[in-house]
Curated annotation (Swiss-Prot):
Keyword Cytoplasm: yes
NCBIfam families, per the entry: rbfA
Protein name: Ribosome-binding factor A
Subcellular location: Cytoplasm
Residue runs in coiled coils: none
Underlying gene: rbfA
Record text on subunit structure and interactions: Monomer. Binds 30S ribosomal subunits, but not 50S ribosomal subunits or 70S ribosomes.
The organism's place on the tree of life at top rank: Bacteria
Gene Ontology CC annotations of this record: cytosol
Main location: cytoplasm
Job description of the protein: One of several proteins that assist in the late maturation steps of the functional core of the 30S ribosomal subunit. Associates with free 30S ribosomal subunits (but not with 30S subunits that are part of 70S ribosomes or polysomes). Required for efficient processing of 16S rRNA. May interact with the 5'-terminal helix region of 16S rRNA.
């Protein structure tokens, strides 16, 4: 798949999923307060990883991912309609550990050292 086309599909997937969650089109109660960070489509265009985070506990994280994965058909149908795709990538939702690590690193770097003297 053309890299430019791939980036366009990935960007539209992020927009579509975020918009559908925010607008309340996803009725699953497990899916709320979710941030969609990025998407990565496979070379053949058949699979897509969508990376998300939410403010929740580890137990709740599993429920959020389960809710998103159960609603993946709705997201795929909407994305296919928007982009007119012949092959709609199968969406797999994953927790974005890389984003969380970068936030932790940023917080660590911005903290002011405390003087105990």
């Amino acid at each position: 798949m053309n890299p430019i086309r791939r980036r366009k599909i990935e960007a539209e997937a992020v927009r579509t999923v975020a918009m559908m969650i925010l607008s309340g089109k996803v009725k699953d109660p497990r899916v709320h307060m979710v941030s969609v960070h990025r998407a990565e489509i496979s070379e053949d265009g058949k699979n897509m990883k969508v990376f998300v985070t939410a403010i929740c506990t580890d137990k709740k994280k599993i429920k959020v991912l389960s809710g998103l994965n159960s609603a993946s058909g709705l997201f795929q149908a909407t994305l296919s309609g928007k982009l007119g795709l012949r092959i709609t990538p199968r969406m797999h939702f994953l927790w974005d550990e890389e984003y969380i690590q970068s936030l932790d690193e940023s917080l660590r770097l911005t903290r002011k050292p405390t003087n105990t003297d």
